[in-house]
Amino acid sequence: MLQHHIEQHSVIDNQRLVVTLASTQAEIEDAQRLRYEIFAKEMGAKISSINGLDIDKYDEHCQHLIVKDEDNGCVVGCYRLLTIDGARKVGGWYSAGEFDLSRIEHVLERTVELGRACVHKDYRNGGVVLLLWTGLVKFMQLENLSYMIGCGSISMSDGGHTAASLYRKLEKKYLSPLEYRVFPHVPVQLDKLKQDLEVSTPALIKGYLRA
């Protein structure tokens, strides 16, 4: 089974961790519970919930990459992975609800969409993220995938000034060629926002840019 090829054990800061694909409904629900704890309770996101689980229509069509603490059995990190087969079954990519993906249509057959990435607050020492990325690379190799897409979160709590400044900061070096560029369905009106604030790049987005 695919999870056996991805599974990898590691000891980080005396924590015995393993990355694998969820193989039971209980493991998937543990990941959904972690997502709810972080996105809803910690970050204040307004998301639908069933019994304290973050669940939407995409979940049943995704693979769920998880990191577990082998000493207590808890899921302490997760990623949701959607490939072209799952996207067809659910009616499209999650990202397509936010962006026009037509310019990258030609690469979607070999693409994995990443979503719902999170790490338990007691395990944010970098080790869990490293294991998730190790598992992700292995998954892409086994599935013969070459591209990653997904939505990265940037706070809009200040009305969008931080987001606008971050965009201006990153576009100088990281803006993709036009033929690979996607466009938001509801764009931020940059000309109405401050674009010169000193801002930090969110850790997850910084990691993607280094990949």
Predicted regions and their residues:
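Short amphipathic alpha-helix that is part of the acyltransferase structural core
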Residues: 4-85
